[in-house]
Amino acid sequence: MSRQAATALSTGTSKCPPSQRVPALTDTTASNNDLASLFECPVCFDYVLPPILQCQSGHLVCSNCRPKLTCCPTCRGPLGSIRNLAVEKVANSVLFPCKYSASGCEITLPHTKKAEHEELCEFRPYSCPCPGASCKWQGSLDAVMPHLMHQHKSITTLQGEDIVFLATDINLPGAVDWVMMQSCFGFHFMLVLEKQEKYDGHQQFFAIVQLIGTRKQAENFAYRLELNGHRRRLTWEATPRSIHEGIATAIMNSDCLVFDTSIAQLFAENGNLGINVTISMC
């Protein structure tokens, strides 16, 4: 199979828990929804969850908004620090909607599992996956690729499951990132090579692939990175990271292709390093 090759320019420095899908509206469902609505914070309209504190008149406000307030937003009285144990007991029997329900998540779950689910929810806004950039963009999964195409136009995209990722000028000093996109199997993958000083005086390269998609979708693929040349070969195979996870943790834990500058020189030619990238379906 022929490989495509392109130059990567330096950029500078859910799987959700098993869901309880919302069924057709029944008396039980309506009753639960009515109860859940009683826990809505009057400031942010998220839910007030245990531990629940009330003002002297019995009004509730969520723990995120409470530190920002000087008085009760409902009655303007003192906030106080009265804990409402009876309401907390009711909260234990209510199934609360995910905070991303307006974006399409249909899961309802106990308050004890709500925060954990929302951290992994596939409807949570995605951040810009471009490393080394100070881009603060967030949006839906469908909007990620249009954002990259319009705001990060220097990133090259190659078609096919078997390509060459060419990082130029790898001897540049300091922390440097190289980024390229690969499109195959109807999905887009971001290839990232980072050079950073993880330990004092010891620079290393970290290469990884992430899917522009959910964690569940990422599990359907595997990627292989290979340095090849001068009768030497260095290979790494793994499951792509979802852009929901990001790559910072993987790099911190060395859960990617890792090699130091001396190894890079064994495979580089004229300061450029080619990495063979193969994406396959599991």
Swiss-Prot record:
Zn(2+) 1 binds at residues 98, 105, 117, 121. It catalyses: S-ubiquitinyl-[E2 ubiquitin-conjugating enzyme]-L-cysteine + [acceptor protein]-L-lysine = [E2 ubiquitin-conjugating enzyme]-L-cysteine + N(6)-ubiquitinyl-[acceptor protein]-L-lysine. One of its GO terms (cellular component) is nucleus. Widely expressed at low level in embryos and adults. Due to the high similarity between SIAH1A and SIAH1B, it is difficult to distinguish its own tissue specificity. Overexpressed in endothelial cells of adult lung. It comes from the Eukaryota. Keywords: Cytoplasm, Metal-binding, Nucleus, Phosphoprotein, Transferase, Ubl conjugation pathway, Zinc, Zinc-finger. Residues 1-17 have a biased composition (Polar residues). Induction: Induced by p53/TP53, suggesting that it may be required to modulate p53/TP53 response. Its EC number is 2.3.2.27. Residues 90-282 are annotated as: SBD. Zn(2+) 2 binds at residues 128, 135, 147, 152. A zinc finger (RING-type) spans 41-76. Phosphorylated on Ser-19 by ATM and ATR. Residues 1-23 are annotated as: Disordered. GO terms for biological process: neuron apoptotic process; proteasome-mediated ubiquitin-dependent protein catabolic process; protein ubiquitination; ubiquitin-dependent protein catabolic process. The modification Phosphoserine is found at residue 19. GO terms for molecular function: ubiquitin protein ligase activity; ubiquitin-protein transferase activity; zinc ion binding. Pathway: Protein modification; protein ubiquitination. Its main location: cytoplasm. It holds the Pfam family Sina_ZnF. It is found in: Cytoplasm; Nucleus. Belongs to the SINA (Seven in absentia) family. Homodimer. This is E3 ubiquitin-protein ligase SIAH1B. It comes from Mus musculus (Mouse).
